Structure formats: C-alpha cells, structure tokens
Amino acid sequence: QFLYIEWMNEAYENYAFILYKTLIIRIAMLVAIFTFVKTADDIVPYAIVMSATTILNYLLSFLWIKREVSFVKIGLMELIKASKPLLTMLLLANANMLYTLLDRMFITKGPDENYISYYTIASSIVMLIASVLSGAINVSIPRLGYYLGKKDYESYKNLLNQGAALFYFLIIPTSIGIMVLGNYAAVIYSSEKYLEAGIVTSVFAFRTIIWAIELILGKQIIFINDHENRLTAFYFIGGGANILLNSLLYFNNIFAPEYYIATTIIAETVVVLLEIYFIKKHHLLDLKEIFTTLTRYTIVSLG
C-alpha cells in the first residue's frame, strides 16, 4: 500500500496513463487467471496472480508520478502538523461504515440468512452501475481544485454545474429504470433463486438518487472548499441516526433488508439537509441550477 499513489496521477490529470495502464494490467490479469487457475481449488495461484497484478499496478503508478514529483525531507514537527488533517481524512474515508456496512451487520443477526444475500445482491447491482457513472464527475475534482486555487470562481461554478448536469443526466434515468425493473435486474444478476432481491434492488436504486445528490454537495462543494472537518461531522451525525434507526428495527425483530435501506435513506437525507444548510450559510455556491437540473431530469425520467 505504500506504493499506492494513484491519487497523485489524478491530481496531475494523467488520465491517459491511468486508462492504458489499467487496460493492459486487467488484460494481463485475465490471461494469467485463465492460464494458471484451472480448478476451484487453485486458490494459491489465484492469490499470486491477484497480488502480482496489484503490486504491478501500484508500482507503475509510483514510477510514472516519480517523473514529475520529487521526494522532500519532512521534519518531525511538520509531520505532526500534517497528521491532524490526515486523521480527518481517515475518518472521512471510513465514515461509510456507518451506513450500508452497518446495515449488513444488523441484517446478519436476523433469522433468515437469505436477507443478507438480498441486500448484497441489490447493493452490488446498483453500486456497480453508480460507481461507473460517478466517474463522470470524479475526474473533474482536480480541475475544480485548480480553479479554486487560482480564485477563478466563475470557471469553478461553470465546471461544477456542467459536471452535475452530466452526472444527473446519467444517474437519474438509470436509478428510476432500476427501480421499475428491480425484479428483472435481480434475476439477470443472480438467477430466479433470488427473485425476492428485486424489491430490495428497487429500494436501493431510490437510495442512489440521494447518494448522487450528496456526492455533488459533499465532495465537489464542501470538501473541495476545505471544509472536510464539517463534512466528516455531517457523516457521523447521519451515521449516528442510522445506528439509532437500525437499533430500533433490531429490537423490534425487523430484519427485512428493505427496511434497513430505508433507514440509510433517512440518514443520508439528514446529511444532505445539513450540507444544503452549510452551503447556503457560508455562501459556497448558489444551488438553484443544480437542483433545477435534478428536478428536470427526474420529471423527464418519470414521464
């Protein structure tokens, strides 16, 4: 992990290198798997292939960025000073454990072991698609930071609104489509044995809309404007609400996965409302255009 430096390549917008490197390594990984993994018992060869490709991926990224960035000596006091924001980032990166991962922990306590399968299938279907679509805005974060660093607020606003419009154009119709076709998606992904995961998939798809709103407000507005401390606090407030709601379901012997997704929706809605209030209070951005775009695509998709 000490070689993991992909975020630096993203910061320098080396996306062509990331694309070609990833394609080559993934192809090599597939060839190696089909060559060395012959049976279900070939666990060691599979582990070696996966470990080797991961190390190669990290090493190539490290060597590439080393051409542009040099090592610098950091004193002990500077290291201690830098540890505080790094601790905040650590908490921010792991705050998701208080949402969907927490839901799974409670669901596993239920009497029906299929419940966790339904939740996992729904999560895999929806988030697999959502994570691909979110790439449309994730690549813009370094450029947004660049504009803010230059105090070019007009360019920042234009790029943010364009990215949000593209993201919502992709994610809103997709989420509503999965909501309608949840049963079919579950069957295609996991066979008719898990047909009951269909309703869970539909509810999870609705949750993705809230997730998409939070992604823009949290990452591209609050976080990029150096308010990661407040963003972390909002995530933990929402996580606390999710713990409370999940506990309420647990003590009432309710373990159906759709109810736990509903608690996550409520918790993430709390986070979104806190973020909207914070953005308006500190005048970080006029949110009218973003929510107008969101409403427009929602109406068109429902129509």
Show which residues each predicted segment covers.
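Helix-loop junctions and terminal segments of transmembrane helices
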Residues: 122, 126, 130-164, 168-171, ...
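Membrane-interface junctions at transmembrane-helix termini in multi-pass inner-membrane proteins
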Residues: 1-20, 205-237
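Membrane-interface helix-loop junctions in multi-pass transport and translocation proteins
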Residues: 12-17, 23-58, 228-229, 238-272, ...
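Interhelical loop/hinge segments that connect adjacent transmembrane helices in multipass membrane
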Residues: 43-49, 59-100, 105, 139, ...
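Alpha-helical transmembrane segments of multi-pass membrane transport and lipid-handling proteins
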Residues: 1, 160-213, 240-252
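Interfacial/gating helices of multi-pass transporter permease domains
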Residues: 43, 81-89, 107-127, 154-159, ...
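Helix-terminus/linker motif at the lipid-water interface of multi-pass membrane proteins
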Residues: 35-39, 97-128, 146-147, 183-193
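Membrane-interface "helix-start" segments
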Residues: 17, 78-88, 166-167, 200, ...
